[in-house]
């Protein structure tokens, strides 16, 4: 698939990583972040890369367990991603995810 820089790329960890390391920042109110068709300077980026999101309630009777699982998913759980062709999330996304997870309460 042709990316914004005009190069043809294929789906894979290298192209996804190139898209994920682009300089795009998450929306501070929603944490939404798009890495689809990143700027030209990311010439190795696969143009239709995206993040996988989890929608969870901010208030839950199971908040402690939910937070524990989500923290694991965005930290140690990232080690399982490459075997499933998922690129680990970049540090900038991890910081936002941890702040958001911390808001979950009973």
Predicted regions, residues:
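Flexible, solvent-exposed loop/hinge segments that line or gate ligand/substrate-binding clefts
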Residues: 1-76, 84-106
């Amino acid at each position: 698939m042709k990316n914004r820089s005009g190069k043809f790329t294929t789906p894979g960890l290298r192209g996804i990583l190139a898209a994920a390391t682009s300089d795009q920042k998450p929306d501070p109110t929603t944490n939404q972040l798009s890495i689809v068709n990143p700027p030209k300077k990311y010439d190795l980026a696969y143009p239709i890369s995206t993040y996988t999101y989890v929608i969870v309630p901010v208030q839950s009777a199971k908040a402690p367990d939910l937070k524990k699982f989500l923290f694991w998913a965005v930290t140690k759980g990232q080690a399982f991603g490459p075997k499933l062709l998922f690129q680990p999330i970049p540090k900038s996304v991890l910081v936002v995810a941890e702040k958001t997870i911390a808001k979950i309460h009973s």
